[in-house]
Amino acid sequence: MGLFDIFRPTDINEELKTMKETPGAVLLDVREVDEYEEEHIPDSVNIPLSEFDQIENMHYEKDTPLFVYCHSGRRSGAAVLRLRELGYTNAKNIGGIIHYKKV
């Protein structure tokens, strides 16, 4: 996966299906707390991008499948870049909640 693939639009609904089929996967919402409280995808964990160094306190293994979303996909792309800098090898930007369809 190349650098620009991190920001390439994906279908969040398809990615969520993949996440549910992936053992040990974590759904990570990197929006601010107030955005998360207003609306979020069930079973997601909120770590705002602005407080992202907290990820190290979550004790995820470096190869944990992390499916990352935000509002539109931009912050989640930045979060995936930061995760890679921190050594996480299995993080994926799945886009924005604005395209999420509740099923």
What would you call each of these model-derived segments?
Residues 7, 31, 48-50, 95:
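Residues at the C-termini of beta-strands that transition into short coil/loop
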Residues 36-42, 101:
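Short loop/helix-cap segments at secondary-structure boundaries that form the rim of catalytic
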Residues 43-67:
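Helix-loop module immediately N-terminal to the HCX5R catalytic loop
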Residues 34, 51-53, 98:
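Acidic phosphotransfer microenvironment of two-component signaling modules
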Residues 27, 44-46, 91-93:
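Conserved beta-strand scaffold positions in the cores of enzyme catalytic domains, especially
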